[in-house]
Curated annotation (Swiss-Prot):
This is Large ribosomal subunit protein bL12. InterPro entries: Ribosomal_bL12, Ribosomal_bL12_C, Ribosomal_bL12_C/ClpS-like, Ribosomal_bL12_oligo, Ribosomal_bL12_oligo_N_sf. The lineage of its organism: Bacteria, Pseudomonadati, Pseudomonadota, Alphaproteobacteria, Rhodobacterales. Belongs to the bacterial ribosomal protein bL12 family. One of its GO terms (biological process) is translation. One of its GO terms (cellular component) is cytosolic large ribosomal subunit. It comes from Cereibacter sphaeroides (strain ATCC 17025 / ATH 2.4.3).
Length: 124
């Protein structure tokens, strides 16, 4: 039982990037697809935020595609996030949030830099 507790602690302690890598490993090696519950959890806060109808002031910068020139995109991700080379490379290859809760001006500046480097980026 102690081994299961240790495993649970390790899983809970994963960073977002590590969790993304774990998901990829489970899917590719073992054929385990993510549960539908994840999509429900993501949709919940968005539905709650909709009635407010206030102008959004914080944005998440999400990398959807690294494009053909990954090296320049990795450099920009490192500059924006302060991540190490391996972590930035993993983030670029996996896609996902580059920065969370950035101001509108900062998020647009990050999006512009990443797009100039060849990436496809969304602001959410």
């Amino acid at each position: 039982m102690a081994d299961l507790n240790k495993l649970a602690e390790d899983i809970v302690g994963l960073t977002l990037l590590e969790a993304q890598e774990l998901k990829t490993i489970l899917k590719d090696k073992y054929g385990i697809e993510p549960a539908a519950g994840g999509a429900v959890m993501v949709a919940g806060p968005a539905a709650a935020a909709a009635p407010a109808e206030e102008e959004k002031t914080e944005f998440d910068v999400v990398l959807t595609d690294a494009g053909a020139n990954k090296i320049n995109v990795i450099k920009e991700v490192r500059a924006i996030t302060g991540l190490g080379l391996k972590e930035a490379k993993d983030l670029v290859e996996a896609g996902g949030k580059v920065k969370e809760a950035a101001s509108k001006a900062d998020a647009e500046a990050m999006k512009k830099k990443l797009e100039e480097a060849g990436a496809k980026v969304e602001l959410k």
